[in-house]
A protein has these predicted regions:
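Short secondary-structure subsegments characteristic of cysteine-rich extracellular domains
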Residues: 89-110
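Short catalytic/ligand-binding loop motif for oxyanion handling, primarily in non-cytosolic enzymes
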Residues: 68-73, 85, 124-128, 303-305
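Active-site/acyl-donor-binding loops of N-acyltransferases
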Residues: 2, 9-13, 37, 135-164, ...
């Protein structure tokens, strides 16, 4: 199958981004803008396009970094690989073609690689994975289940319905909270990048209160500067009638899907229910702007999970992360080093709990640096 492999050069971003945006599913983490974000932290991108079966080509933006002093590089395909379509009948050829591309072209471009981690945004038991077809295909191609880096489940809101139907999908109490915030004079505004400092202050307060790790302010500026020029990012604030920002969301888009990976609120925002109005407006205006789905990005637990479920949508469980081990010793050493790094970072920031590599969002993905 090697004669059908195509290596997309790093500067062919327009072709690549079009492929990802048209994929089913596609993810903002597979866009060239995300590679631009991660390049600041020493990650390089290798874009692979393989196979040409019934489901079309399968491709992945592979982020690669060699953490010192290890001699191996780690490779990660965040929310990929992606394809124009997935079917149970075509899964075996697709997985095999992508594994071959990793073993050959990736080694050629990136050198000594311990393992490649993938986490395709495919629903477990969904149409593509009927009777476990994709999971069987991944195993047959040499992949094995691995610890997750990104959320292994989420809640997706279908924006095909009209606004009245979306409003009706909110729990009654949630609609009351939205109206309460409006009555209190809370408004939602789109903002420019010059307000990222305010975003970060609220996000930091939220992280300290909830006990999760976030990155530096510059990291979120990098996200904004990579996606916003292409019309793929929005910064929203819920403000009191006095103009005080009390809740915020940073949204990112790929194709028809809007994702909310970052957001938070102040204590005052919680008291005024501004966060309810903010999320409703994010959903409503995303539909207005032509989006077809809204990803709440993870299910979380406890109060956050309860909050998200009140906005409707459908709970989706993904196939999870899978490793293609290219060097068994390197894979073992990398795993131990990553776990130790997470513990050190949690202690440095004074956060309780054991933590894990997945809790740290895994370098090439979310809030890890």
């Amino acid at each position: 199958m090697s004669d059908r492999l195509t290596n997309l050069h790093a500067d062919d971003t327009a072709t690549w981004d079009a492929f990802v945006s048209d994929a089913r599913p596609g993810s903002y983490l597979q866009l060239s803008s995300w590679a631009q974000v991660k390049a600041v932290n020493g990650w390089s991108a290798v874009r692979l396009l393989a196979g040409d079966g019934a489901d079309g080509p399968i491709g992945g933006q592979v982020l690669v970094r060699r953490p010192r002093p290890l001699p191996w590089a780690f490779a990660y395909v965040p929310r990929g690989p992606v394809a124009p379509g997935w079917s149970p009948g075509g899964a075996a050829d697709a997985a095999s073609a992508f594994a071959e591309a990793c073993r050959s072209t990736l080694r050629e471009r990136a050198g000594r690689v311990s393992h490649v981690r993938v986490d395709p945004e495919l629903e477990e038991g969904g149409p593509a994975d009927e009777d476990g077809a994709v999971r069987r295909a991944l195993r047959a191609a040499g992949f094995r289940p691995a610890p997750p880096i990104h959320p292994n489940a989420s809640r997706i809101i279908d924006l095909a319905a009209d606004e009245d139907a979306l409003w009706g999908d909110l729990r009654k109490k949630w609609r009351q909270y939205v109206n309460k915030a409006r009555s209190a004079g809370v408004t939602v505004v789109d903002a420019d990048g010059d307000r990222l400092g305010e975003f970060y202050a609220i996000y930091r307060e939220t992280a300290d209160r909830a006990g999760f790790l976030i990155r530096t302010e510059q990291a979120y500026r990098d996200v904004w500067e990579a996606f916003a020029p292409h019309g793929l990012a929005r910064l929203l604030f819920a403000q009191t009638k006095d103009g005080e920002p009390v809740a915020t969301l940073l949204l990112v888009r790929c194709g028809g899907r809007v994702v909310e990976p970052y957001g938070g609120m102040t204590a005052a925002g919680g008291d005024s229910r501004a966060n309810y109005l903010l999320k409703w407006e994010a959903i409503r205006t995303s539909r207005e702007q032509g989006a077809t789905s809204y990803d709440l990005w993870g299910l979380a637990t406890g109060g956050i999970a309860h909050f998200k479920t009140g906005f409707g949508g459908r709970e989706v469980k993904y196939l999870g992360a899978w490793d293609l081990v290219l060097d068994p010793l390197g894979r073992q050493v990398y795993g131990a080093a990553q776990a130790a790094r997470v513990q050190i970072e949690r202690r440095r920031r004074g956060l309780s709990g054991g933590g894990s590599a997945s809790a740290f969002a895994g370098d090439a993905g979310g809030d890890a640096a």
